[in-house]
Amino acid sequence: MKLYSDHILIGSAFQSGTLEFDERFSIFTPGMKPSSMQNTGSGCTEENGRPGARGKGAEDVLDYSGFYIIPGLVDIHTHAAMGADASDGDDAEMQTMSRFYAQNGVTSWCPTTMTLKEPELKEACRTISHFRRPEDGARSVGVHLEGPFVCMEKRGAQNPENIHVPDVEMLKRLNEAAGGTVRLVTMAPETEGGIAFVREASKLCTISLGHTMADYDTAMRAFFAGASHVTHLFNAMQPIHHRKPGLIAAAYDAGATAELICDGMHVEPSVMRMAEKLFGRNLVLVSDSLRCTGMPEGDYPFGGQMITLRNGRATLKGTDTIAGSVISLMEGVRRVVDFGMPLADAVLAASSTPARAIRMDHEIGSIRAGKRADMVALDKSLKVRKVWIDGREAVSSES
């Protein structure tokens, strides 16, 4: 299969040219539009006057002039959507979420669990490991355990009854239940045994510092021990202070990748712009989406607690504590572009950088020979019009 566009994101810049792909990308040829195809205005190839007809020697080239072709997005921090939740351990709910993500330009995702009891986490991990994506759904690339190894003071919306000290053996049991696919663990390094946990657990997966009271020195010790990522920068951690720099400054000094919830509510837009300038290519956009994403206002279960969705904001019921976002990652990309981030940078922060953060950038996250042929066609308003996963059409919305 071949595809032409005048705006294909190759590396960090949009270029014109032709992509060749089947399940994997094979080559990108920059330059002019192939002469054997005509633009019908609908993103289709027209040969011999009839869409889909192919004359002798005609190339199978899809014409996406006027569309942005970007890598499939990679959401490494998303709990739930459309009434379904990864923590429920239900395959039908995983199918629902998978389709929602694909419809919104996400081709790979890390089902993200909450701070639950070990038996519940095991069941969720088993379900995630056995999940097989539908043809019109995004692939799960492994588990993100957001807890239970977090601190009480910065637990946010995590259930305090299930918080557990960092335990490597427990992580190994959960990883076994997940079929060896735990990709990311959020933990608080200042808790009992935290640094020793980081040293051992980082051999299995990416360790992220989050839901933590860690000061600068403790955070740096954790980064030196093997941590390399930060969960939702600015949220559920101590704020930066000119004499108490804390985790945020440590993450910058250590060259860690850092998540940013991109709904414009968790972090004010001017601070988001500052974070982009500070972290650059180490910035990771995430949705941190909840069960009520895509659902009507009301109350919803969440990790053994209840959350309330009102006016586009989800909070722990009866409190002002933000529980997570109610947007897709693609909607987050649109918002940060509106806030002033260049489109190419926003897409990189939602594709190649998260793939690198979970050690999967050899396979997903960018348009490059040998990688999975996951890509999204966006119109000029950044709406998803087509999604390909493993080189096959998964979503089409061109009307």
Across the structure, where does each feature detected by a protein language model lie?
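Metal-associated gating/positioning segment near the N- to mid-region
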Residues: 64-123
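Conserved, mostly hydrophobic/aromatic
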Residues: 145, 201, 230, 336, ...
